[in-house]
């Protein structure tokens, strides 16, 4: 909590007396005295706000019982409200008094009274206060009855002006001056969570003028971002996209907020990840290439920092899937070329990967996989010596579309041909060991081919036992370069779940495989992915078996 200055209490009484004196007299001396003390009074209001914003409304009224009186006198002093800075601070203080969830009629009444003061300040921002008072009286309303409606009307009027609506029946457009836009956005900072103000917030965010510089305050963008991320305000997607376009820190904060939800707690299931990603509105916003590039760069950084952690890879792949879905909903034909989203990759490779692998009929999947493998291999191995950007960029593009890896494993294990296609071997080795040089990758492909042949021979030779399968997966000690352990486990688990012979021994095999927490987490991830694919990608899988195994393993870690 902010510390109360030692002399703030005495200052409080001093300014309350001053406001009463200014209220009772309207002489030139009083006006001169007000102007003389205005800067000091504004500083006092700032100090009060720093204190009030750390307290709830009940605590404020207990500590400062006459705070409403002080702020009301301030609101009705035209010399004080003549300064935009005073308007802004007074509104901030008033918002601190608002009870966000009133439980009694007294609290609701206090909120209505504060709303009246807020509408009065906004009316002072728009019109001469004497005109407002005369207009109110001519309608036969008391101010306390009129102001709640005035606030809504003021918001609607400002929204209409911002949107260039026709005024007074004249076919002309009215645009606010940049200085007034800035002032209005600052006034709205503490109001962004109030339902009556939401249309104005949306109009400000989607306002597009011709000014070369931003006309809204950074504090306004920050306040809207904070309210949106804490779910205190609901905004249409167009307003959120505009917010992120106009204020880069807001986009970065939203992306970090998503990362925190995805990665900071215990492992999220993939379906929960998908819900979080969609609710963030980032995939919809990323249909704009400029936003996508920033979010993608942040994914890249996390991927590098975590050394390709499975949870980060899964989140990136789900995000990409949600993006592709959003692009298809927005327009059947891409508004932007795919190269705009992935500028460091060959357009033909991007186009091939962006196809829906799950939509390819069974029996027609090998050729697209081999085509992708060839394009990736050309991109990776044709780069000049000493250049590491192309291999990483190609791998980073590839991991966005993880569905192709699933298909490659299926094709490798379920095909009847004696020899595994070299293109599939290269694709899997590259996915799991992207840092390898060409010669190392070739050696890994040889070992992977031997391993796949051993597993398939064992599968076709008769009754399958768990121990025989696990022994066949172990690399001989004399192997110069054993296959990546993660890839070996992926092949084993796929074989166990995708073949009838594997179903009979899957419990025993998985029990022996899960000998460390790290491997257990890896198996949990595979099972979760199996359930996710069966639900979303129309891939047949043993759902019941995977669900039972997943529940059992999750209880162990």
From Swiss-Prot:
InterPro entries linked: FANCC (IPR000686)
Its localization reads:
Nucleus; Cytoplasm
**What does the record note on quaternary structure?**
Belongs to the multisubunit FA complex composed of FANCA, FANCB, FANCC, FANCE, FANCF, FANCG, FANCL/PHF9 and FANCM. This complex may also include HSP70. Interacts with ZBTB32. Upon IFNG induction, interacts with STAT1. Interacts with CDK1. Interacts with EIF2AK2.
The protein here is known as Fanconi anemia group C protein homolog
- State the superkingdom: Eukaryota
* Species whose genome carries this gene: Rattus norvegicus
GO biological process: any one? neuronal stem cell population maintenance
Identify the keywords attached in UniProt to this record, alphabetized: Cytoplasm, DNA damage, DNA repair, Nucleus
Q: What is its main location?
A: nucleus
Role this protein plays: DNA repair protein that may operate in a postreplication repair or a cell cycle checkpoint function. May be implicated in interstrand DNA cross-link repair and in the maintenance of normal chromosome stability. Upon IFNG induction, may facilitate STAT1 activation by recruiting STAT1 to IFNGR1.
Keyword Plastid (UniProt): no
Q: Name one GO cellular component term.
A: cytosol
